[in-house]
Amino acid sequence: STLMRSSAASDVYKRQKRYMASSEFDKVWTSCESLLAKYHKDNPLHGGMKVAELRQKLFKGADRARADAILSCLAREGKIKSVADRYALADFEVRLTKKQNALKTKLLQIYHKMGLEVENLDDVYVQFERNELADCKQVLESLVSGGELVMLTPQLCIERRIYEDIWEKTKQHFAEHGELTLAEFRDMLGTSRKYALAVLEYYDKNKILKKDGDVRHPGPEF
């Protein structure tokens, strides 16, 4: 999980800072600042760049634990900040227009009302005026990148609070059992197969769980 990765990164923080030459650290920061500044300019409504993308662009094939420790170090020094599964420059803020803020409020109200059993995005967009659609799609991307919504599939988003509740139930299950089936997960969430499968496939894609035949086990990102 993100929390466990953060803990692991903090464990090596002092060692990382100690053996990394200040000139090398400054060089990494300069590159990081440049990458994120360009990303923010190109994507002003996104909360930040995905951690995996930043790690790959900044460190190429370097050891992942070391890369995460350096990023954690930059965050501790107030140079960058963690936003959901992304990083942003510390002083970056998403700025929405008055119209976009109104769309944001409406979108959040819609998703709050739906809970887990959400409509497809196409059906959500139908609830907006045609001339609002372009802005609406940008605002939804902003809500996903900022962590307020979690995009399970290209058509299904859920509120962050719903996702966190599901994640707690998932962790509790694996604290007591070694594997998980789709039927067990569906019953655990009290929902239909469609939504249970969407969450499981999101877990698979993000290596939180690993599918093995008809069951799933904790993955490397659990």
Predicted regions mapped to residue ranges:
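Short helix-coil junctions and helix-kink-helix linkers
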Residues: 1, 51-64, 123-133, 184-193
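Short amphipathic alpha-helical interface segments
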Residues: 1, 29-49, 100-119, 163-182
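Single conserved hydrophobic/aromatic residue that forms the stacking wall/gate
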Residues: 2-9, 13
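Short amphipathic alpha-helical interaction segments
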Residues: 7-8, 61-70, 130-142, 192-201
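Charged low-complexity interaction tracts in eukaryotic proteins
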Residues: 11-33, 72-101, 141-168, 212-222
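Short, hydrophobic beta-strand segments
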Residues: 18-20, 49-58, 87-94, 121-122, ...
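C-terminal structural cap/anchor segments
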Residues: 106-145
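C-terminal tails and terminal domains of large nucleic-acid-associated
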Residues: 177-222
